[in-house]
Amino acid sequence: MSENPEPSKGSTPNVEGAEKVNKPPVKKGWSNPALRMMGIPKISLPSRNWMIFWTLLASVGGGVAYDRYQQKQIRKKWMEKFEPLGEEAYRTDRIPRKLSVFIAPPPNDYLDSSMVYFRKYVKPLLNASAIDFDVFTENRQGDIRAAVAERIRELRIETNENAKKAQEEAKQEQYDASWTKFFKKDVPNFFTLKFQSNSKEDEALVSSNDLYSPKDVLGLYYLKEPIDAKRDDELNPMEAGGVICIGRGAYKEYMTGVHEGLLGPLEAPEEVRTITEVDPQVTENEPETAHNDNESKAVVELPVLPTDDLPADSVDKQDAVPETPSETAENTPNAEEGDNEKPVPKPFITPDEYPNATYAPEFQNVSLIMNKKNVPVIFEQPVYVFPLPIVSGFLNTHRKLYRFFTKRNVADDYGCRTSVVVQNVSRPFVYKDQFMAKEEELEWPKKWVATGKEKNSEWVQELVTDDRVTTRMKVFDVSLAAKSTDKPIDKPTNE
């Protein structure tokens, strides 16, 4: 036997089998000869991780896209309903109805959060219905309240001055018709003029060119009389204007400002004057709204109210902001000017003093208070508030996500509420109306509310009303307008 026998066939290593074992399995898929000729590989499902990624991305993207599409459709539905009002032809001597819109930032948030809801869900419908409006915003608590109260006080002062002038004119007319004036002034003046020695001078001749110019008589330069344009509010004072408050906070400040203007004194009390003049830095440095550090440095934009109800002298005192037919022009001051901004005036009267306060004597015997343009003043116009569906906090993440994907519900709800304002369906103010948008307070941050109570913030206090003031007020009635939601709006025929 040889020392090195040849290995048997059964003991030879199976190289081909080992290669098959180490080779990865062929991925399952579907292939087509035509696709294979074009260089397209086999069509197969992606891996598990890619499946999770694409499923999540498609779900989120599809949900957002569907919600935005529905918002556009809802907005289009309401705009088509108001289209007959927008197609109405206006002559040069006619101006559409005007609303006043007050917007305040949500608690512990920026003003832009509130402006988004107005610009997306309210403003397009007002523009479609050809309704003019003025927008007033604030970044500090108390700006709206102070502006509304100051406007009413100036209106009361103007009424007092007009009453005094009327009394003086009546006394002068009575004196002119009396015998006292006849014997004291008329008779002496008659003899003085009769025996006056000074002779009259000849009337000086004046050239015709000094009296008038050729363009005063030529048709090319003929100037027509100025057009006296009138608003629709003047035609029917009972359905004039309206007030919209975006947010419960803006509504509270508006109502408090109306009460302060009608029940409070015309001049600041000694306590308020002392706080404002002696120690203004304390009021400036103490933020009434519990914003964070970054928000406390935000630029302040004071509301500028319309001057229709104010005397001519007080118009120059205000910082006039140019208004477009749809929205206020944003004139934002510099950051340095925001730091030097005057503090918000303290209220002239507190809610505890309402029962003992005297109602404005200037308006006690007046059934409907009108301004110079024969339009009811702001607190005689209907008011309504739009609640802000904004939640904050980590524990409310699930609610944030749900509302983020269902903004179409907010668009439809705001559209229904805006139809109330457009159709001008109003009713007298009742006790329950002071709780409008009360549900919004349940979603305010608890820490912010606690801080506001410590600093005696206006927003966290209960809204107190007085019957002497609310009997003059009206609100837009949602219940009546909801019944006529499906009915088309007819084109008005105002001549």
Swiss-Prot record:
UniProt KW keywords: Membrane, Mitochondrion, Mitochondrion inner membrane, Protein transport, Translocation, Transmembrane, Transmembrane helix, Transport
Compositional bias (Polar residues): 1-14, 325-334
Membrane spanning stretches: 50-66
Mitochondrial intermembrane topological intervals: 67-495
Classification via InterPro entries: Lipid_Phosphate_FormReg, Mt_import_IM_translocase_Tim54
Tagged with keyword Transmembrane: yes
Subcellular location: Mitochondrion inner membrane
Membrane topology: Single-pass membrane protein
Any matching Pfam family: Tim54
A GO-annotated cellular component: mitochondrial inner membrane
Positions of the UniProt region annotated as Disordered: 1-27, 280-299, 307-355
Major location category of this protein: mitochondrion
Mitochondrial matrix topological intervals: 1-49
GO biological process: protein transport
Comp. bias intervals (Basic and acidic residues): 288-298
Sequence similarity: Belongs to the TIM54 family.
Subunit structure: Component of the TIM22 complex, whose core is composed of TIM22 and TIM54, associated with the 70 kDa heterohexamer composed of TIM9 and TIM10 (or TIM8 and TIM13).
PANTHER family the record matches: MITOCHONDRIAL IMPORT INNER MEMBRANE TRANSLOCASE SUBUNIT TIM54, SPHINGOSINE KINASE
The protein's role, per its UniProt record: Essential component of the TIM22 complex, a complex that mediates the import and insertion of multi-pass transmembrane proteins into the mitochondrial inner membrane. The TIM22 complex forms a twin-pore translocase that uses the membrane potential as external driving force.
Protein name: Mitochondrial import inner membrane translocase subunit TIM54
Organism per entry: Debaryomyces hansenii (strain ATCC 36239 / CBS 767 / BCRC 21394 / JCM 1990 / NBRC 0083 / IGC 2968)
